[in-house]
């Protein structure tokens, strides 16, 4: 049987370089994408993925010497309009929609239909609504073209962006971390839509740090590292070890390895009994031992974050008792909890954790700056040294400590926030989605820090939606469902910590708890 030739590439980016003042962001990168393909693009933050896609979208101009070809023909993409005309559409993490306009108006933005005299005519909103109705139906939208975008959920707004791309007859669709704000069900719906678009012949460039998504969707995966092209793997050659090794340039066989000694079940550090908030948390109990990493898993909305905030004192509790190091503990504010040695890393670092318009040095020192007071004045030199030490200890990639946190990658922002918490010398550390939105290299550093803290006797609670992460770092796992502890895995129980067991408890398909909680 004669093998058919592979399809001609739809997109070829050859020898693309980009230099910013004092920084070479891309060095001769090439990428080839075929029609009807999901081609994933991976790399650590700062590897050059976003820069390469911004060149494709016309937001940046490449240095002289490279070229972009579509259907084998060289083209010039000198701006976003040229990219759109070439059939390129990009859906960024921060959706580019006008909330006060309708779905139809957002889909037609920049291409409004008008009555009468060309661009001077009045906008024909009825015609625009009719023009995009078929696209919305084709994509399975359950809202109409006249719906105000501001009333839609994030997942629905994302669908509007996809509808706009389809309506402009885009042939190349770039999706940058599209599942970050989505629930599990919304993610499943997005994947169904991606497969539909692939079957219709679109080329989809998919950027994600989540290995499970890469395995599920990708036909091929290309990896960038430090602004250079490393290689491309076919679907049947994918493995976590190969991909991560290509991304970070080193062996990661111990990526999730527990590098701390088994905890002492007789050394109880934190005890929580029947804690509730009257709404999302309905009577939860747990124990945490010195040197233990306790995982908390569950579906979105199960009450994991609410439980953490109750323990931390960020939300009032209606009942329940908490004991810390053998003493009754009832924090009425986060400050009281921090002073007692219990700290919490929020799942939303940008809104609730960091001061984005302040420097790395200021963010690291803000919780402990009172230690540096001398006769009413701050010892700035001491604070600066503390920041330098933290930057070195957590491998924070930053040119200097005075750069604004808002300018850093997600992984480095997370390490700055973690540094601030560690400066308080905690006995108990609660980490809520500690690696969300960070690259593989930063994840590895965060896992290393968790192990070091456990070795030092700190009790660590890790809340995560990534099951491989929970399984890899935790000594025991508690699974929440509908505001309660549904069961325990690992530890003193005979129940192994597996994805299947976690999902069964989280969904209620397995109702027996392995321990009474």
Curated annotation (Swiss-Prot):
Residues the entry annotates as binding ATP: 43-50
Entry keyword annotation includes Lipid biosynthesis: no
Gene3D superfamilies: P-loop containing nucleotide triphosphate hydrolases (3.40.50.300)
One GO term describing the cellular component: plasma membrane
Compartments it resides in: Cell inner membrane
Principal location class: membrane
Membrane topology of this protein: Peripheral membrane protein
Keywords: ATP-binding, Cell inner membrane, Cell membrane, Membrane, Nucleotide-binding, Repeat, Sugar transport, Translocase, Transport
PROSITE patterns: ABC_TRANSPORTER_1 (PS00211), ABC_TRANSPORTER_2 (PS50893), RBSA (PS51254)
Signal peptide limits: none
Swiss-Prot/TrEMBL catalytic activity: D-ribose(out) + ATP + H2O = D-ribose(in) + ADP + phosphate + H(+)
Recorded family membership: Belongs to the ABC transporter superfamily. Ribose importer (TC 3.A.1.2.1) family.
Quaternary structure (record): The complex is composed of an ATP-binding protein (RbsA), two transmembrane proteins (RbsC) and a solute-binding protein (RbsB).
Protein name (Swiss-Prot/TrEMBL): Ribose import ATP-binding protein RbsA
Originating organism: Burkholderia pseudomallei (strain K96243)
